[in-house]
Amino acid sequence: MDWKKLQDLLSGVNQYSTAFGRIWLSVVFVFRVLVYVVAAERVWGDEQKDFDCNTRQPGCTNVCYDNFFPISNIRLWALQLIFVTCPSMLVILHVAYREERERKHRQKHGEHCAKLYSHPGKKHGGLWWTYLFSLIFKLIIELVFLYVLHTLWHGFTMPRLVQCASVVPCPNTVDCYIARPTEKKVFTYFMVGASAVCIILTICEICYLIFHRIMRGLSKDKSTKSISSPKSSSRASTCRCHHKLLESGDLEAVPADDKLQASAPSLTPI
């Protein structure tokens, strides 16, 4: 598997991600992909070859191995890493769609026309929803794979001895021994822990996106209210100053008749 191409594809997501997304990407590549490529593949590389059973019955060892390992840990983790990084491609595709739409708009209306998007990679409008759904998909995928891993092997431990009972073509209960169980258990705990960290980071990023969206909406409401309120506030302040001047005696009260005369229009003969 060429992890370098996957890294090159996902490196473009960094410029559209939040701080939590950048940390998530670092955890994926440093603590999961590198550990998978450098160490985990070697530990599980010869697991079927070193799976020993105390029987000479042809085919019994293979059947017992398949009974206990329906799918290998290393292949399950490879699928998990591929599936968990695929939702990030949605963001890249959406940004590419915006850029292409902007390019066609400029070709049609000229270079000096108004832009469709102030910044194609800014998380506003549909791109915000695409980013949010990609995070939800990643969270669901992580949880599903952890559940599958826990269900297939009845936990995250790696036993030294497994027994195959009533499995054809094995004649009776067969004891089988797993190679390097302690080392495999350590790597399993490490990969599960890294997956749990990614789940926490994804939840934090979802909460951050929603909180940031709410705060931005509240700030827009405040700005619209502040634009519409200066006239009323200036009138109120003028009235307060007028009453204070009347109370201090600096301003004489105008009689009602003078007010009427002042407010009445002056009519001149034609």
Curated annotation (Swiss-Prot):
Residues 1-20, 99-126, 212-270 are cytoplasmic. Pfam families: Connexin. Keywords: Cell junction, Cell membrane, Gap junction, Membrane, Transmembrane, Transmembrane helix. One of its GO terms (cellular component) is cytoplasm. The chain crosses the membrane at residues 21-40, 76-98, 127-149, 189-211. It is a multi-pass membrane protein. GO terms for biological process: cell-cell signaling; cellular response to retinoic acid; in utero embryonic development; placenta development; skin development; spermatogenesis. Its main location: membrane. It is found in: Cell membrane; Cell junction, Gap junction. Gene3D superfamilies: Gap junction channel protein cysteine-rich domain. GO terms for molecular function: gap junction channel activity. Residues 41-75, 150-188 are extracellular. InterPro entries: Connexin (IPR000500), Connexin31 (IPR002269), Connexin_CCC (IPR019570), Connexin_CS (IPR017990), Connexin_N (IPR013092), Connexin_N_sf (IPR038359). One gap junction consists of a cluster of closely packed pairs of transmembrane channels, the connexons, through which materials of low MW diffuse from one cell to a neighboring cell. Belongs to the connexin family. Beta-type (group I) subfamily. A connexon is composed of a hexamer of connexins. Interacts with CNST. This is Gap junction beta-3 protein. It comes from Rattus norvegicus.
